[in-house]
Amino acid sequence: MRPEGRAAGQIRPLRLTRHYTKHAEGSVLVEFGDTKVLCTASVDEGVPRFLKGQGQGWVTAEYGMLPRSTHSRMAREAAKGKQGGRTMEIQRLIARSLRAAVDLKKLGEFTITLDCDVIQADGGTRTASITGACVALADALGALVAAGKLKESPLKGMVAAVSVGIVAGGAVCDLEYVEDSAAETDMNVVMMEDGRMIEVQGTAEGEPFSHEELLTLLALARDGIGQIIQAQKTALEQ
């Protein structure tokens, strides 16, 4: 039995609250059960040096966890003087995922920075960050259009992500912390709304997984992401 009696393919209760802060061009509080992440999208004119003069934009990301977002307090990375490897890996994943959603040529010479700050962690913080950041990105692009700086939104489609894994011998979708810590296989999947995959990160923590189990996990992820993208679209219509 899963926590809260969820079915194998059932995601946690999902909530996307837009315009959560007033300064950023896009801001979303995303909640997957007890995992809560604040995602903001900030627009700056200009692009990194390696893109200057090419007539295209850039999307980048930063990720962090508040000290007491976890069961016991973590020291701030700023206090340590450097980012950890996990943080750098996750923010690169978020940036890669969201760049896939944007026509960078149509964006023009603007840079959009997605900041994902974990307020409370209960598993799936990187997938929640991607899901929330995509909605914040859509709002930021809409703000550029509304300001007359872009003729149309360069968003090619929604992007969302979910974790899947094998827990106690069974494939499940959207793992919370107690499941993630006990998973025999843990996988994060990022997809476009048309079903094309952007990234698949999968690791056997205990017993290696079979080809058939891989296909089962990908099917669970596809169905879960379908539910998430519908929630994103519903939020953007409000």
UniProtKB/Swiss-Prot annotation:
Coiled-coil zones: none
Catalysed transformations (reactions): tRNA(n+1) + phosphate = tRNA(n) + a ribonucleoside 5'-diphosphate
Keyword Ligase: no
InterPro entries in alphabetical order: ExoRNase_PH_dom1 (IPR001247), ExoRNase_PH_dom2 (IPR015847), ExoRNase_PH_dom2_sf (IPR036345), PNPase/RNase_PH_dom_sf (IPR027408), Ribosomal_Su5_D2-typ_SF (IPR020568), RNase_PH (IPR050080), RNase_PH_bac-type (IPR002381), RNase_PH_CS (IPR018336)
PROSITE patterns: RIBONUCLEASE_PH
CDD domains: RNase_PH_bact
Alphabetic keyword roster: Nucleotidyltransferase, RNA-binding, rRNA processing, Transferase, tRNA processing, tRNA-binding
GO biological process, one term: tRNA processing
Enzyme Commission number(s) of this protein: 2.7.7.56
Family, as annotated: Belongs to the RNase PH family.
The protein's assembly and partners: Homohexameric ring arranged as a trimer of dimers.
Protein name: Ribonuclease PH
Taxonomic lineage from the root: Bacteria, Pseudomonadati, Pseudomonadota, Gammaproteobacteria, Enterobacterales
